[in-house]
Each structure stands twice: as structure tokens, then as C-alpha cells.
């Protein structure tokens, strides 16, 4: 996964790709073609759809009008508040794990190491990386790992050692994947919910920082850029996060010079995460 991910670096690292609101894996596959082509010798990309059906998201129409059905990872705010967080987060986890299992059953091999996402999918990728970091820290201290699935329950998603995330247009805040962090606005569709700032009252200093490597790609013409900068500035450690801004709107860049730079940064970041390609 990185949004979803080369396995061990002597083979390939598996990158999981997560779609944005009102999109799907097929659309993201097309949008990341240039990136995928340049990284194919180091990473294998696996694409996952969100668990919920959705209307087309920003920028999807009219180009991808025939590419439905469209999906989302989070429901709209009014729908969200009617759903128990545990059921919502478990639906996301099972959806991701289903994609991982299908990929492995098809004969794929390699270690899941990174997460990559666009828009709402990037928010999810950052949240999975944070939750993985949280659980690893607790395990190393011999503590009880609590999640919506139960205490100390092994699951495919959380058994992976996620190491880094590539975040295209990813907004704040993080999504809570455990009851202990339910003060995070775990179900707000932040990039389209003007009320999300009132819901996000957590102080993200110290223990709520993502300390694993993250690459934030933000278009300066993106109307949701302020929220995306907040994810970078408020929720990620300055020592391990990198910001790349480009002259674009709410989309994944396809310009060759930008893609080349991003690919180089991703390879450096993967090595920073202690994975060395042989």
C-alpha cells in the first residue's frame, strides 16, 4: 500500500493506492500512470476502492463520466454522524484487507511497506500510517493494543510495518482508527465539510505527530490547499516530512519534470525508511 506499494527491495515493494472522494481504483490507475512507469523497477502498485458508493468527486466529470461506480472512504457528514465509528472504521479496514488478500492470492509477493493516496485517500493513507506507528510503539513497550476490532487482535492491515506515505492533496485532520483517539474527527469528510475545524479540537503536538516519512504534494491552485498544508504542518514531524508545491489544482500532477522529481523523492524516502534496494 503506500496508498496502496516494492516488497523487499531485492524484489519489489508493494504500494497501495487509495482513491479520493467520488473516484475509484480504475481512475487512479490512469492518473498515476506516469508515476507508476518510472517506479516500476522498485515498487509495485496495488489499487483499492473505498467501501462506500458516492457521487462523482471534484474533477471526475466529465472526463471519467463512464468510469463508475464511484466510491469514497468516508461518507458525507450527515450520513457519517448516523453511523457508529466502529462500524465505519471496520468497513474501511476490511475493504483494504480484502484488496491485499486478492493481490496475494493472484500470485503477487513482496512486503507491504508504503501508502499513497489522493485527496480523501491521502487523508486515509496518513491516518493508517499514524495508527500503524501508534500500534508499533505500544507493542514495543509491551502494552495492550486497542482498536475497533478489539484488544491485541491481529489483522492483516495492522500486522504490516507501514513505513512511509505519499500524500497527493491530502487534507487534515487525521481519521481515528481506535477508540482511544475518537476525539479526532474520525468521520468528517474534511475536504468538503466546512464544520470540520470545529470538530478537530485535538492538540497534535508530541504523541499525535506522524514521525515516519511523509511526502506531501500540494497544488497551489487547489481550493483545499490550506487544509492540506495543515496536515503537513500540524500532524507530521518536521524532521520526517517533505512538502512539494506545484502550479496546479486538485489533481495528481502528470507533468514530466514534476513526476521525475517526485519519483526521486519517493526513492530517497523509501531508503530513509530503512529499505535498501539491492
Swiss-Prot record:
GO biological process: secondary metabolite biosynthetic process
Domain of life: Eukaryota
Catalytic machinery residues: 119, 222, 250
Pathway: Mycotoxin biosynthesis
InterPro entries registered for this protein in UniProt: AB_hydrolase_fold (IPR029058), FSH-like_dom (IPR005645), LovG (IPR050593)
Family listed: Belongs to the LovG family.
SUPFAM superfamilies linked to this entry: alpha/beta-Hydrolases
EC numbers for this chain: 3.1.2.-
Effect of deleting the gene: Leads to the loss of T-Toxin production, resulting in low virulence for maize.
Pfam hit, one: FSH1
Encoding gene per record: TOX9
UniProt keyword list: Hydrolase
Gene3D superfamilies in the record: alpha/beta hydrolase (3.40.50.1820)
Disulfide bonds: none
Organism: Cochliobolus heterostrophus (strain C4 / ATCC 48331 / race T) (Southern corn leaf blight fungus)
A GO MF term: hydrolase activity
Record's function text: Probable esterase; part of the Tox1A locus, one of the 2 loci that mediate the biosynthesis of T-toxin, a family of linear polyketides 37 to 45 carbons in length, of which the major component is 41 carbons, and which leads to high virulence to maize. One of the PKSs (PKS1 or PKS2) could synthesize a precursor, used subsequently by the other PKS as starter unit, to add additional carbons.
Name of this protein: Probable esterase TOX9
Gene Ontology CC annotation, any one: nucleus
